[in-house]
Amino acid sequence: MRKIIVGSRKSKLALTQTNWFIDQLKALGLPYEFEVKEIVTKGDVILDVTLSKVGGKGLFVKEIEHALLTKEIDMAVHSMKDMPAVLPEGLMIGCTPKRVDPRDAFISKSGASFKELAEGAILGTSSLRRSAQLLAARPDLQVKWIRGNIDTRLRKLKEEDYDAIILATAGLQRMGWDDEVITEHLDETLCVPAVGQGALAIECREDDTDLLQLLAHINDAVTERTVAAERVFLHKLEGGCQVPIAGYATLTENDAIELTALVGSMDGSVLLKETVVGTDPEKVGLEAADRLIKQGAKELILAANKGQQ
């Protein structure tokens, strides 16, 4: 019986996601054993700086990918939104389980909705994507950076001078917080989700055919296609955490991919947005990027990157 070593970050959410995925594999009843190996990433260690200033994509995966390449582990369970657009040679996303709710969750101290928040209220987020879109809708709000896991951020909302914070609905749901704390789910038209938000990425070595066959049982074709379009868009624009960039794709009734893509200025004064429909994930992602580039997306990205230096 083969033992599969599964790499995971040490956070409660990461371990919950990893153990959930292992349970899906165990339920197949095939002759495999599983062991979790906890790995500390750079993003887990640097907590006093905003993600955009630390260096963006790959912060939560590089050490785990090193363990995959050196065969310390056989596969890893990541949040898809943490994944860089390009993976190291020899590694691949071997499985994308069914995506859960991709929306952002708005949590306010007083129970006021986003629209009802008092003028000049303080909004906590560590995401340039969220802050740009929400400032575009409410330029009167003040954005204050907030880092830490879900528990830490909820505690900071309670104890510090934040009036509201934004978290990913998916993480809250996976941790069992959902209805208990969420004031409202922000509609995708108000705040386009991050590329891959709500989805998991199961990363493994390309040459591990045995494991790839096992992972195929859990793969969700709809999630795979839609997330692929989002990631092609992200790659073409070379976007990471340093840039207000968003992309969210769904399947239409006739099986086409509909991708809404967005790039914004840091302060939300400019939001470029396009919706592209097509059947091929790569073509849809590239078309969305090309349309935004024609509108000036590259200049916005350049300005955002300069602003982080």
Swiss-Prot record:
The keyword Isomerase does not apply. Binds 1 dipyrromethane group covalently. Its cofactor is dipyrromethane. Pfam families: Porphobil_deam (PF01379), Porphobil_deamC (PF03900). PROSITE patterns: PORPHOBILINOGEN_DEAM. The porphobilinogen subunits are added to the dipyrromethane group. Tetrapolymerization of the monopyrrole PBG into the hydroxymethylbilane pre-uroporphyrinogen in several discrete steps. This is Porphobilinogen deaminase. The gene is hemC.
